[in-house]
UniProtKB/Swiss-Prot annotation:
Keywords: Glycosyltransferase, Transferase. The lineage of its organism: Eukaryota, Viridiplantae, Streptophyta, Embryophyta, Tracheophyta. PANTHER family: GLYCOSYLTRANSFERASE, OS04G0273600 PROTEIN. The gene is UGT92A1. GO terms for molecular function: glucosyltransferase activity; UDP-glycosyltransferase activity. This is UDP-glycosyltransferase 92A1. UDP-alpha-D-glucose binds at residues 292, 358-360, 375-383, 397-400.
């Protein structure tokens, strides 16, 4: 028999230290706060935990009226061989990402101390924890102190399922073939070795990444459930996989997207982008952006620039310095692009270059935008699908390759342009893919139609009145969390 629902609820959220994790956690926290304000029967408090330098980043993403409290756990990056500002994925080169992952395990005891403290303070309140999959030890700590806990994955279920299976089993090491099936996820289809990020491809079970993953992933079984930033109608295969291998509830609650943060970029950039888009015909623009952490080779930049110019399509390109060039301040794009490129596209008004950051949601929601050339990060995919914009995929790292597989092979809203940061890519190949999706080809018409259909599926998932699948998922999670009695 279920216990009576407690009157008060304390929600503790702990994202990993990276903007791609923090921002979805903030978006989920704000959604939960909104739900709890509407449900006045319970007094609810929400806290977010992180390290000292990440607390201001979280605070900057919260509206001033939010009552979400921020809790700082002690952490000194220099104690772990990291730069003094090395508390966030975004501030580190890829070579040091594993060092931050390993260092995060030092937060376990401070987290336990914090949980012990609030359990003494909260009395009869129900305390639940929402943790990050890179902080897999959270589940065990919560089980030991008697607190209900779930993982919130900012990644989709299909992508994370492939990621989990490969790290635990390293199936590509068992075959000389270029393609292989996943041991416990064969329904995902064949994976190609070129669809593995560099750390996976080089893994042998004794390398730093393998050792870390084999410590963290088994800890996922200590959690009482999973929340996924995804939509059941497009990610059922991945959700079913996690239900099968974990035996615990798995809830889709996406898309969990934060409203655009107007403080990130300058007002002049937003106005320039809007004015430029307003001047273009409907469905005529290619938007190119590879996320906040990814850069491409300078040779790739040259080929991409030539392709965008040769395609004769309008485009917005968010330009970052190429791989190997660390430029934290302003940089001159002319040094990395074909001679006269910026002047020609400015004169013709056919292209707009934006440095480092652009108002992505504003661009994707604009009627002039036709297709998104993306690194296939999950947040970018959700933003694109939410606005009915098909994709040109160029996956580069992490689970992005598997996201690309899902979008192209299983959903049909994407065409892969390139694969990885070291691939060979030619101007003509990019041009042909752009035209394939944007012009009146059979493939292009079908992909654009499918993207519009998926937009409607995503919209319905979040509709309150008719109880969309993600609305139901979040309600079921909260209902279970409120009555769950954790067995010690």
């Amino acid at each position: 028999m279920a216990e009576a629902k407690p009157r008060n609820l304390r929600i503790v959220m702990f994202p990993f230290m990276g903007q791609g994790h923090i921002i979805p956690f903030v978006a989920l926290a704000l959604r939960l706060e909104k739900i709890m304000i509407m449900n006045r029967a319970n007094k609810t408090t929400i806290s977010m935990i992180n390290t000292p330098s990440n607390i201001p980043k979280i605070r900057s993403n919260l509206p001033p009226e939010s009552s979400i409290s921020l809790i700082e756990l002690p952490f000194n990056s220099s104690d772990h061989g990291l730069p003094h500002d090395g508390e966030n994925f975004d501030s580190l080169p890829y070579s040091l990402v594993i060092s931050l992952l390993e260092a995060s395990r030092s937060l376990r005891e401070p987290f336990r101390d914090f949980m012990t403290k609030i359990l003494k303070e909260e009395g009869q309140s129900s305390v639940i924890v929402i943790g990050d999959f890179f902080l897999g030890w959270i589940g065990k700590v919560c089980k030991e102190v008697g607190v209900y806990s779930v993982i919130f994955s900012a990644s989709g279920a299909f992508g994370l399922g492939c990621y989990r299976s490969i790290w635990l089993n390293l199936p590509h090491k068992e075959t000389k073939q270029d393609q292989f099936l996943l041991d416990d996820f064969p329904e995902a289809g064949e994976i190609e070795k070129t669809q593995l990020n560099s750390f996976m491809l080089e893994a042998d079970g004794t390398d730093d990444w393998s050792v870390f993953m084999k410590k963290i992933i088994p800890g996922w079984s200590d959690f009482d459930g999973f929340l996924f930033n995804t939509v059941a109608e497009i990610d059922q295969m991945g959700l079913s996989y996690f239900r099968r291998i974990t035996g615990v509830p798995v809830w889709p609650v996406g898309p969990v997207l934060k409203s655009p943060d107007k403080k990130v970029g300058s007002r002049s950039t937003e106005e320039a982008v809007k004015s430029w888009l307003d001047s273009k015909p409907d469905h005529s623009v290619v938007y190119v952006c590879f996320g906040s952490m990814n850069s491409i080779l300078q040779t790739h930049m040259l080929e991409l620039a030539m392709a965008l110019e040769s395609s004769e399509k309008n485009f917005i390109w968010v330009v970052r310095p190429p791989i190997g060039v660390e430029v934290k301040s302003e940089f001159d794009v002319k040094g990395y692009l074909p001679e006269g490129f910026e002047e020609r596209i400015t004169r013709s008004e056919r292209g707009l270059l934006v440095k480092k950051w652009a108002p992505q949601v504003d661009i994707l929601s604009h009627k002039a935008t036709c297709v998104f050339l993306s690194h296939c990060g999950w947040n970018s995919i959700l933003e694109s699908l939410s606005h009915g914009v098909p994709l040109l995929g160029w996956p580069m790292a992490a689970e992005q390759f598997f996201n690309s597989i899902l979008m192209e092979k299983h959903i049909g809203v994407s065409v892969e342009v390139a694969r990885g940061k070291r691939c060979e890519i030619k101007c003509d190949d990019i041009v042909s893919k752009i035209k394939l999706v944007m012009e009146e080809t059979e493939v292009g018409k079908e992909i654009r139609k499918k993207a519009r259909e998926v937009k409607e599926l995503v919209r319905r998932a979040m509709v309150d009145g008719v109880k969309g699948s993600s609305v139901i998922g979040l309600e079921e999670f909260l209902d279970q969390a409120m009555v769950k009695k954790v067995e010690n």
